[in-house]
Amino acid sequence: WRAVIADSVVMSLVQGNEIDIENFTSEEGKGVYLDKEGIEYVERTGTTTDEVQLAADALVADGVDAVFTPTDNTIMTAELSIYEKFIDAGIPQYTGADSFALNGAFVGYGVDYANLGQKTADMIADILMNDADPATTSVETFDNGTATVNTETSEGLGLDLETVKKEPLCTQVNEIVTAESFDDVEK
């Protein structure tokens, strides 16, 4: 994976293989977006938990304003060992899945799986019950999702949870506390 640090708004960790880095810097990629918006960023690399920890230390030393980590198993494995570094430095970490927020990141933003499941079920029912042609069934995309906010991290960053939840650009905002797994969270 690679760490992309933005001195203004966004920092991103992306898979470190050539295809993903190519996509990240492509016309459709975030690198182009950041450049276009005049947002400064730097890159860090790491392929092990130890290297991810060192990259997190470097991000803190760089004084970045924010971190964004898309869904990545290497980062997920290291999350419980890096999230406190960002809290202590006052750096919010935004991520691509709720499991990262569970493991201490400030916000996990991802697919609204209930909405996705309903739409998928509707498409399958249309094919099975109404003889819709799978080959001509349109591909559906969603432009919103679910934000999961770690309340402990929000507090550690000195952020007011109600302000964080105000006017979200997603279908819902869920609250969670830090734990190793969803089974460990009291319902």
Where is each model-derived feature located?
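Periplasmic-binding protein-like
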Residues: 10-13, 42, 64-75, 94-96
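Hydrophobic alpha-helical segments within soluble ligand-binding/sensing domains
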Residues: 1-6, 111-132
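Solvent-exposed loop/turn segments at secondary-structure junctions
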Residues: 15-20, 48-51, 72-76, 98-102
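Structural motif
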Residues: 45-60
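Glycine-rich, charge-decorated loop segments at or immediately adjacent to ligand/cofactor-binding or catalytic sites
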Residues: 52-54, 101-110
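Venus flytrap/periplasmic-binding-protein-like
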Residues: 78, 82-106
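An alpha-beta-alpha
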Residues: 1-37, 137-153
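Hinge/cleft segment of the Venus flytrap/periplasmic-binding protein
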Residues: 126-187
